[in-house]
Design a protein with these regions (language model features):
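Alpha-helical scaffolding within the catalytic cores
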Residues: 55-62, 117, 138-139, 186
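Short glycine/threonine-rich loop-to-helix capping motif typified by GTGT followed
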Residues: 81-94, 121-136
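Substrate-binding cleft of carbohydrate-active enzyme catalytic domains
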Residues: 4-105, 109
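Active-site beta-loop-alpha junctions enriched in small/polar residues
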Residues: 15-21, 78-80, 114-117, 134-136, ...
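Carbohydrate-binding surfaces of carbohydrate-active enzymes
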Residues: 104-106, 115, 213, 225
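Flexible, acidic glycine-rich loops studded with aromatic residues
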Residues: 122-129, 136-225
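Hydrophobic faces of well-ordered beta-strands that scaffold small-molecule active sites
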Residues: 12-16, 73-75, 109-111, 129-133, ...
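Acidic, contiguous N-terminal accessory segments
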Residues: 109-118, 125
Length: 225
């Protein structure tokens, strides 16, 4: 699919979302799930967690015919617990490790903004790293720009769709977005238009719920309406 869409000048950025939102991984390998923070969190204190995730990324990135053929790879890093300082530092080290890991395959790393939520002392690489700026409480955009990240503006309060969930949008408020919003507005933070550290904007559709009557066609209608 990446090759087909690239030929049509559409870039697919594949994502393996770790170390949270990782139930697909812990269902397969329960021993790397966190007993303290829930099985959707990987246990960052176990060496086998890194062995497994390293091997998973390698499976998609290495060889003469890799699955991920584009120039960018998303490593997730969304919504991990910040309950304790030691786990925050582990999360920051994990993030830095996988930024550098995918760069080792010639890819540009993309992450979800989380480093204000996970504020700590462990350095996380920022040079040539793209960050989805989705919620300013998780990643303050001014701080992230100062730290050297390139941002994609995707503020959840304006451009998140969760079909028939009762929170966020069911359909985007397109007239408002067209008339009032630009990617320079990230939550309540406003930057100069065409700021060199803001690459552009995106919207997201998240299928948080199954069995609520929403079909693939319904999802497409929300995207293309």
């Amino acid at each position: 699919m990446c090759i087909r869409d690239r030929s049509n000048f559409v870039e697919i950025i594949p994502e393996i979302d770790v170390p949270a939102h990782s139930l697909a991984l812990t269902h397969y390998k329960p021993e790397i799930g966190s007993k303290e923070y829930g099985m959707d969190h990987l246990d960052l204190f176990k060496p086998e967690t890194y062995e497994f995730v390293d091997a998973l990324f390698k499976e998609y990135l290495e060889g003469d015919n890799p699955v991920f053929v584009g120039k960018r790879v998303h490593i997730g890093t969304d919504e991990y617990s910040n309950a304790k300082k030691d786990v925050v530092e582990k999360f920051r080290a994990f993030t830095d490790h996988y930024i550098r890991f995918v760069e080792g395959f010639g890819k540009q790393a993309v992450v979800w903004g989380a480093l204000s939520h996970a504020k700590g002392d462990t350095p996380v690489k920022s040079e040539n790293v793209v960050m989805n700026a989705w919620y300013n409480g998780y990643a303050d955009p001014a701080t992230m720009i100062k730290d050297g990240y390139q941002l994609i503006s995707i503020p959840d309060g304006l451009v998140y769709i969760v079909p028939k969930a009762g929170y966020y949008y069911d359909y985007l408020n397109e007239p408002y977005l067209y008339k009032e919003w630009t990617p320079a507005h990230i939550g309540k933070a406003v930057f100069d238009e065409k700021h060199p550290s803001i690459l552009g904007g995106m919207f997201a559709i998240w299928n948080d719920h199954v069995g609520n009557g929403i079909s693939v066609k319904d999802i497409h209608h929300r995207i293309f309406s």
